[in-house]
């Protein structure tokens, strides 16, 4: 890449993105720092259990301050891009709607797919930057044989973020740099220290950025209250897969597939949530074996390594961020739908989550489990 070109660095205020900026600056690139302001932590801080205003991850004022301080240290221009309205529309509201209907959403993927990369590239273009660079642990390069950009798993498997990036387009991949793709997290912290960044020991972000305490149930209650609404009545029956009513629950949003605790039913053997039937307000429970399945369907597919799925393909399929990819066969069942058949049964396949498909290190594509 021509070092006279300008790169916009997405700066979250964390170690990873700050190190990316320091690395590229040291290599002689022209840089501009950009922070996406997505959520005002003060909005719900008055609600019980949400802590002091401004406390949080990724969206807090502390993180903006840290990003600005790094930009000043590196002597690069820095801008904050306010996208709170779009974030609420495209990420927060779908998150709330999904939980209330019995699905378990992934807001980080929604944010990457529908907002973050799109807006970063738009802003970069407006300020004269040809590419963006982020602190994600992933790799990308152009495959001359297929004529397509590829997204690949990083060197540090423990930090692999490709699961959340399956929605990236060819245009986005062609204009994005992932400088940390060949590094491990300890190496990144050491690089940050060597570059004189005071935040080299800053803890990693763990929570959903707009739910800093991790309690999504309190968030739902607080957010709906702010909107002048209240939690809808989604209470209903606890039933077995055969239809036997074994109890009642106070709201379908309190459960997710695979959950064992908090069912309120005493039996001779452990029970787990097998399925959530939002239309009937039923929580289906059963034993652990009933959580196992060999098949799933996914919709709203995004293909990366291939332009489309012309015939059945052998892949490794990943059904949640911490899930070890498992051998499976995929085949199209509709214009935007695939059937994934695993060699071995997988536990707790959850509607609302993503399934991401791999050919070795290469992300073939991904979609939303239905």
Swiss-Prot record:
InterPro entries: MnmA-like (IPR004506), MnmA-like_C (IPR046885), MnmA-like_central (IPR046884), MnmA-like_central_sf (IPR023382), Rossmann-like_a/b/a_fold (IPR014729). GO terms for molecular function: ATP binding; tRNA binding; tRNA-uridine 2-sulfurtransferase activity. CDD domains: MnmA_TRMU-like. The active site is at residues 111, 209. It is found in: Cytoplasm. It is an enzyme of class 2 (transferase). PANTHER family: MITOCHONDRIAL TRNA-SPECIFIC 2-THIOURIDYLASE 1, TRNA 5-METHYLAMINOMETHYL-2-THIOURIDYLATE -METHYLTRANSFERASE. Catalyzes the 2-thiolation of uridine at the wobble position (U34) of tRNA, leading to the formation of s(2)U34. Belongs to the MnmA/TRMU family. This is tRNA-specific 2-thiouridylase MnmA. The gene is mnmA.
């Amino acid at each position: 890449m021509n070092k006279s070109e300008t790169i916009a660095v997405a700066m979250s205020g964390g170690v990873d993105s700050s190190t990316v900026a320091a690395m590229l600056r040291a290599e002689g690139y022209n840089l501009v720092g950009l922070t996406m302001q997505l959520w005002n932590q003060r909005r719900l801080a008055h609600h019980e259990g949400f802590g002091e205003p401004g406390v949080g991850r990724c969206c807090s004022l502390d993180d903006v301050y840290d990003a600005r301080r790094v930009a000043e240290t590196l002597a690069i221009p820095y801008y904050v891009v306010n996208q709170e309205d779009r974030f609420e529309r495209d990420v927060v509201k779908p998150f709330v709607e999904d939980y209330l209907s019995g699905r378990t959403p992934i807001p980080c993927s929604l944010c990457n797919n529908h907002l973050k990369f799109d807006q970063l590239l738009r802003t970069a273009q407006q300020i004269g930057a040809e590419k963006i660079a982020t602190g994600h642990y992933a790799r990308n390069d152009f495959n001359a044989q297929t004529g397509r950009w590829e997204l690949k798993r990083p060197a540090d498997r423990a930090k692999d973020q490709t699961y959340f990036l399956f929605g990236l387009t060819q245009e986005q991949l062609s204009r994005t740099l992932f400088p940390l793709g060949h590094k491990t997290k300890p190496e990144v912290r050491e690089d940050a220290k060597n570059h004189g960044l005071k935040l080299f020991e800053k803890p990693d972000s763990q929570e959903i950025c707009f739910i800093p305490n991790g309690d999504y149930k309190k968030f739902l209650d607080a957010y709906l209250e702010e909107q002048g609404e209240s939690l809808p009545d989604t209470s209903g029956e606890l039933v077995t897969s055969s239809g036997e009513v074994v109890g009642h629950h106070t709201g379908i949003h309190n459960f997710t597939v695979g959950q064992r605790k908090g069912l309120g039913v005493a039996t001779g053997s452990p029970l787990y949530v097998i399925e959530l039937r939002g239309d009937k307000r039923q929580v289906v429970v059963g034993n652990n074996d009933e959580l196992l399945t060999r098949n799933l369907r996914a919709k709203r597919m995004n293909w990366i390594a291939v332009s489309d799925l012309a015939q059945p393909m052998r892949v490794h399929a990943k059904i949640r961020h911490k899930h070890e990819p498992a051998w499976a066969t995929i085949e199209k069942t509709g214009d935007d739908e695939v059937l994934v058949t695993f060699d071995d049964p997988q536990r707790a396949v959850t509607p609302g989550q993503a399934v991401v498909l791999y050919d070795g290190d290469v992300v073939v594509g991904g979609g939303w489990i239905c």
